[in-house]
């Protein structure tokens, strides 16, 4: 059996200029990065704004195993299948972070015969967007430290700077650092730290900005810290939003690539869903909606994280809301949520599928709360048995949710045809009536309680003393009408990653609240969630290499 990278490298790529002609994009609309990658010009983005808006399909998942459940694979395979049945379709997904690529995932461009290509480029440096975001973020850090060194005219309290440096790697040693050591010429000594690039507010801003002017406005609104009198300091006070926008002027343009089957795909932006809002860029999604009849997009991790944030944070910035939500489930994840140990997930266990179904059922119920029809996609694995599949289909029928087996990893577009037909039928027969979970005018506490009690099904929210102080500060500064972006483990509805399935009557503790004024939301940190991940005992990097001819080895 071929590996993902072997399949990808066996495909004869089409020039990107030919791929995008299918959706009305011409050569002059592109800024090429070689033959197979391009950015879309702002002229074309503005030109298509007058076009009618197509149908939007959001792909999410149940609470995953550490290896993931194939959301990107299903997203890509579904789009290929929609094109196969005659529906003009585009993809809009996130670009991978090098941290997880080198860490546990080894790649994030789909899998098997449902991949975006060239996968090696996408998984590594791609068009340089991650580096531009990293540079803009760290340029701001350098400008803050220079301001302190040059006399601190703004009266910034160096103990209350909340802006951190970033790097696009998993590096736990950088979580807490001290800068400015050595001598007075090296700046003002202070405590600092690094986040992973995809947790940077600049990443979120890039993914929510609608044009260069909106980008500058959002950058100007970033809160970097506080003065000695506790008043906030914004990027606009440093007068550097223009310089930061300049660094990002190309990164904000959506990237175009192709699938194995030649479906045009936007791959742009990559915030994590457990520590950020977990969605690709508004620009890419909005543009795809105006170029194609169907746009398939995804939101990170389970529906409790990515989908909730897509619907409460991203959707209000889009020209339409999702017409259907596809919830990806695997029998191995259902069995894990049903109490089976990780080393026994490939063994048949119908009762564990029944027990784990409570997790999937809750996600279906939650999507319906937003007024959107759900479809379940079973991402097929070779270890699945007929009895397990039949049981899952029976359970889905009991709650009235359509379900289809998808074999896109093994069979490509053909393996997603029944899923595509079911999604199209669902959209036609069950019109969506989108509603947000909460009103932004509610208090910070009320919005968090809504998410915890209605989506997670917890019974109570506890706010640590630090969080209570931060809420008072947020209210004092009139920031309390922003939506909430929960930072929580992806493995459980609760803030305890070991509490699998469908836990109830648990309490969630909010330990910290971070205002992201540029992005336009407040991050609520729970449990032990880290904004700088660490590497596993055996990183995927140990299996990677490059051949003498430059061919990548070991990505998957």
Swiss-Prot record:
For this chain, the family text in UniProt reads:
Belongs to the formate--tetrahydrofolate ligase family.
Descriptive protein name: Formate--tetrahydrofolate ligase 2
Pathway per the UniProt entry: One-carbon metabolism; tetrahydrofolate interconversion
Give start-end ranges for the coiled-coil region(s).
Answer: none
- CDD domains, A to Z: FTHFS
InterPro entries, per the entry: Formate_THF_ligase, Formate_THF_ligase_CS, P-loop_NTPase
One of the GO BP terms on file: tetrahydrofolate interconversion
Q: Where does ATP bind?
A: 65-72
Catalytic activity as recorded in UniProt: (6S)-5,6,7,8-tetrahydrofolate + formate + ATP = (6R)-10-formyltetrahydrofolate + ADP + phosphate
Quote the gene name from the UniProt entry: fhs2
The protein's matches in NCBIfam families, at most eight in alphabetical order, are given as: PRK13505.1
Q: Which UniProt keywords apply?
A: ATP-binding, Ligase, Nucleotide-binding, One-carbon metabolism
Organism classification:
Bacteria, Bacillati, Bacillota, Bacilli, Lactobacillales
Identify the EC number(s). Answer: 6.3.4.3
Disulfide topology? none
UniProt organism field: Streptococcus sanguinis (strain SK36)
């Amino acid at each position: 059996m071929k590996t993902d990278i072997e399949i990808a490298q066996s495909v004869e790529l089409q020039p990107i200029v030919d791929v995008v002609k299918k959706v009305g994009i011409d050569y002059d609309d592109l800024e090429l990065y070689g033959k197979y990658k391009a950015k879309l010009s702002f002229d074309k983005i503005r030109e298509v704004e007058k076009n009618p808006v197509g149908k939007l399909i959001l792909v999410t998942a149940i609470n995953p195993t550490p290896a993931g459940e194939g959301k990107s694979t299903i997203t890509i395979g579904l789009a290929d299948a929609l094109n196969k049945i005659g529906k003009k379709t585009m993809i809009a997904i996130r670009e991978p972070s090098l941290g997880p690529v080198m860490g546990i995932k080894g790649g994030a461009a789909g899998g098997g015969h449902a991949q975006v290509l060239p996968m090696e480029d996408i998984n590594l440096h791609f068009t340089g967007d991650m580096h531009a975001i990293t540079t803009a973020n760290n340029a701001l850090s350098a400008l803050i430290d220079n301001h302190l060194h040059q006399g601190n005219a703004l009266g910034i309290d160096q103990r209350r700077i909340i802006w951190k440096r970033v790097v696009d790697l998993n590096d736990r040693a950088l979580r807490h650092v001290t800068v400015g050591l050595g001598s007075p010429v090296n700046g003002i000594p202070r405590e600092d730290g690094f986040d992973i690039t995809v947790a940077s507010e600049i990443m979120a801003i890039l993914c929510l900005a609608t044009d260069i002017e909106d980008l500058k406005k959002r950058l100007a609104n970033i809160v970097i810290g506080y003065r000695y009198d506790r008043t906030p300091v914004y990027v606009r006070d440093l007068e550097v939003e223009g310089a930061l926008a300049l660094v990002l002027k190309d990164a904000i343009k959506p990237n175009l690539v192709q699938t194995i089957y030649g479906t045009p795909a936007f791959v742009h932006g990559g915030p994590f869903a457990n520590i950020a809002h977990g969605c690709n860029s508004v620009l890419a999604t909005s543009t795809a909606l105006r170029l194609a009849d169907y746009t398939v997009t995804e939101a990170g991790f389970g529906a409790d994280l990515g989908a909730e944030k897509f619907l409460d944070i991203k959707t209000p910035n889009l020209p339409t809301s999702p017409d259907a939500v596809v919830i990806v489930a695997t029998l191995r994840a259902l069995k894990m949520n049903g109490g089976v140990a990780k080393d026994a997930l490939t063994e048949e266990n119908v009762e564990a599928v029944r027990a784990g179904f409570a997790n999937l059922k809750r996600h279906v119920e939650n999507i319906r709360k937003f007024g959107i029809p759900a479809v379940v996609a079973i991402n097929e694995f070779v270890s699945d048995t007929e009895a397990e599949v039949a049981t899952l289909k029976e359970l889905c029928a009991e709650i009235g949710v359509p379900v289809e087996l998808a074999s896109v990893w093994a069979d490509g577009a053909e393996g997603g045809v029944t899923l595509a037909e079911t999604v199209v039928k669902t959209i036609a027969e069950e019109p969506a009536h989108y509603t947000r979970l909460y009103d932004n005018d509610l208090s910070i506490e009320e919005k968090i309680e809504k998410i915890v009690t209605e989506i997670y099904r917890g019974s109570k929210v506890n706010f640590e003393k630090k969080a209570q102080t931060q809420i008072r500060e947020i209210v004092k500064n009139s920031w309390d009408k922003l939506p909430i972006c929960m930072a929580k483990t992806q493995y459980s509805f609760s803030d305890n990653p070991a509490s699998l399935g469908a836990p109830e009557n648990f309490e969630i503790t909010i330990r910290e609240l971070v205002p992201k004024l540029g992005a336009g939301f407040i991050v609520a940190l729970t449990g032990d969630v880290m904004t700088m991940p660490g590497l596993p005992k055996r990183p995927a990097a140990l299996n990677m290499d490059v051949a003498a001819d430059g061919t990548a080895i070991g990505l998957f």
